[in-house]
């Protein structure tokens, strides 16, 4: 007899969007819920200037594991790395059209890239996709990358880019102390410090300046 089981294809193939139930955590028993009630970290309010985002509850962690977070997975692609170089080159060409001197052209390029990156990766919270039940509503895109694993190759690349950009632009305004200090402050305080582990899940609230920037 001919064994046809090897030639037959499975009737159902797992879709990329099929929930990953293997990583889900077990639901706590009723006794655990009574002894240790679950608190929703997203509802907490703090009047202090500096606060720290609490770890997700088990419901949020399960929601995060259900489907891939498409808001952050694209950042790991090598093509996404190239986008940063292309954006910097385009900014440099754009500002050179106005006849600015090289030091001002590189200053505007440096500040535009770093501030734009900060708004996109460190200021806006949540995700435009509603696949995870709002489990990422309290996290920035930077905190969503690589499941919050620090110093991955992608994170290191994104950390090095503003530093290299500053070193390149520094060749043009090294004799101008004002521009040097301005670019140094922007690079360090906005381009580097928010990417370090000491600022992970850290929130600095300045009344009237920083607000609840979140994708809805």
Curated annotation (Swiss-Prot):
The modification Phosphothreonine is found at residue 18. Residues 1-78, 125-148, 199-216 are cytoplasmic. The modification Phosphoserine is found at residues 9, 15, 22, 29, 51. GO terms for cellular component: endoplasmic reticulum; endoplasmic reticulum membrane; serine palmitoyltransferase complex. Changing residue 9 to A: Induces dysregulation of sphingolipid synthesis. Phosphorylated in case of disruption of sphingolipid synthesis. Phosphorylation regulates the inhibitory activity of serine palmitoyltransferases (LCB1 and LCB2). This is Protein ORM2. It comes from Saccharomyces cerevisiae (strain ATCC 204508 / S288c) (Baker's yeast). The gene is ORM2.
């Amino acid at each position: 007899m001919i064994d046809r089981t090897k030639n037959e294809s499975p009737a159902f193939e797992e879709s990329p969007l099929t929930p990953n139930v293997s990583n889900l955590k077990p639901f706590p028993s009723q006794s655990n819920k009574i002894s240790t009630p679950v608190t929703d970290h997203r509802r907490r309010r703090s009047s202090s200037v500096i606060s720290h985002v609490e770890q997700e509850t088990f419901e949020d962690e399960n929601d995060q594991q259900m489907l891939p977070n498409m808001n952050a997975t694209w950042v790991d692609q090598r093509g996404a790395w190239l986008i940063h170089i292309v954006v910097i080159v385009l900014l440099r060409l754009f500002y050179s059209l106005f006849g600015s001197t090289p030091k001002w052209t590189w200053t505007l390029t440096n500040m535009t890239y770093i501030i734009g990156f900060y708004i996109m990766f460190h200021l806006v919270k949540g995700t435009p996709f509603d696949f995870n039940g709002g489990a990422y509503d309290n996290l920035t895109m930077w905190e969503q990358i690589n499941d919050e694993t620090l110093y991955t190759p992608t994170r290191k690349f994104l950390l090095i880019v503003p530093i290299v950009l500053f070193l390149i632009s520094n060749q043009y305004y090294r004799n101008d102390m004002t521009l040097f200090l301005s670019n140094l402050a922007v690079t360090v305080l906005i381009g580097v410090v928010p990417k370090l582990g000491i600022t992970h899940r850290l929130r600095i609230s300045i009344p009237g300046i920083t607000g609840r920037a979140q994708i809805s």
